[in-house]
Amino acid sequence: MYYVGIMSGTSLDGIDAVLVDFSGPSFSLLHTCYIPYDQSLRAALLGLNQAGENELHRAAILSNQLSGWYAQAVGRLLEKSGIDPGEIIAVGCHGQTIRHCPQPENGYSIQLVNGALLAELTGMTVVTDFRSRDIAAGGQGAPLVPAFHHEMFAHRDIHRLIINIGGITNITSLPVSGGVNGFDCGPGNMLMDAWCLKHTGMTYDHNGSWAESGRVINPLLENLLNFPYFSLPPPKSTGREMFSLDWLQPCLRGDEATQDVQSTLLQLTVRTITDSVETYYPAVRELYLCGGGAHNGTLVTRLQQQLPGRRINLTDALGIEADWVEACAFAWLARQSIERAPGNLPAVTGATGSRTLGAIYPA
């Protein structure tokens, strides 16, 4: 039972693709592929995250372009594996989020991918648009990965937390009782990456070394933490619409050292994680990290300092490398769609009930 999962997250760095096998008693991650976005595509996608002229046309063109990139990722996986395309049951493609607005009335979430075109380019069944059904059922449409976390990482005797540090940070609680819950804590890498790009020209702060060279500006940090989202109770989700440099700018005096702001933004990510853990899961002692932020040594060190007595590891220790968890999740969500099985967790998203997610484009 071969499936492909494709994820391109809010960090806008590129495409993660995986080839997985669900046929055995346990999940198998067979092959992986990463394709970085070029500067022009990344800039175009960033431009669509804000209101502008001719948005519908630009979104349609970019959706087609992205589908070509996604097809390229699928092709590379097949080359690596030697598996015949006809053996792939489905491709689960999240698409590239450009708007996430799950308000109670007229809520929506838009991910760029042309599912019909991707099905034509690959000759495979494609599943996309995973978030809309949950929002239609009164949910946030996010986070969706906790259902996969429960399937893969739950332990019958140990309460675990899975913390995904992507553009946005989300946390999944996997209690022994099985009552899974989770939510978006706040910005993960998103603000750090944007500040780093603006002031160094680099797309991210490797290992958090630039942040480490600065100092935390505590008044700025406390000002940022006073933002209402952080005190909202779950279920809740967020995105680039809420957290961007436009959000940060009014909080700056203008004379701060750029490395100090970077250090403060890293500490914001750390604090929103630790505050979430201490508020909702104070007794949990096992934390597992995934997503790009899991490789930020400065962030992980500060997280360990803020959460003494907890064991913090990568999800690699549970059998899935930290970089590929989300892409694997969308392969699993595609399987749930094909098998007409639920893909959301109402306790996480706030939906009125379990739903089969995704729109299917047959091969």
Curated annotation (Swiss-Prot):
Where is ATP annotated to bind?
A: 9-16
Concerning InterPro entries, the annotation shows: Anhydro_N_Ac-Mur_kinase, ATPase_NBD
What does it catalyze? 1,6-anhydro-N-acetyl-beta-muramate + ATP + H2O = N-acetyl-D-muramate 6-phosphate + ADP + H(+)
Keyword Kinase applies: yes
Example GO molecular function: phosphotransferase activity, alcohol group as acceptor
List the NCBIfam families.
PRK09585.1-3 (NF007139)
Q: What is this protein called?
A: Anhydro-N-acetylmuramic acid kinase
Q: Which organism is it from?
A: Nitrosomonas europaea (strain ATCC 19718 / CIP 103999 / KCTC 2705 / NBRC 14298)
* Gene that encodes it: anmK
